[in-house]
Design a protein with these regions (language model features):
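Terminal alpha-helical segments
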Residues: 1-127
Length: 127
């Protein structure tokens, strides 16, 4: 299980780095990568608690149920995750709607904050 947790956490770090690298040239990609940074970070954290999911909606539900409602994470981080998910859907599937530079910048900041809050929740030695 630690290998899976480590893999997911490293994907989170790579996604955050990709978001930062593409911000100025492609805000849509940056917004999408920021969401995936948070998604993989949450997936790693939930796996550390013995939970695995295959759907984005299941990860979101578990985040709110098992990490937010339990008090392990602040409620504002749940709202931030929802913001990232909504923006990713706009960036990836919005047609003429796009993520702005400002919203993509905000997404990166929120993803970074989520990952910072998640890291202490990971099992010892997992990353």
């Amino acid at each position: 299980m630690k290998e899976f947790i480590r893999s997911q956490w490293m994907k989170a770090m790579r996604s955050l780095a990709a978001a930062e690298a593409t911000l100025d040239t492609d805000p849509d990609s940056a917004a999408s990568r920021a969401y995936y940074a948070a998604f993989h970070g949450v997936t790693a954290t939930l796996a550390g608690r013995g939970m695995e999911f295959t759907k984005h909606t299941a990860v979101r539900a578990a985040l709110h149920r098992d990490l937010i409602q339990s008090g392990a994470l602040s409620a504002h981080l749940g709202r931030d995750y929802d913001f990232l998910l909504d923006l990713r859907e706009t960036a990836d599937y919005g047609g003429v709607a796009e993520a702005s530079l400002a919203s993509a910048t905000k997404a990166i900041e929120k993803a970074r904050a989520i990952l910072a809050a998640l890291q202490p929740l990971l099992p010892d030695g997992a990353v």
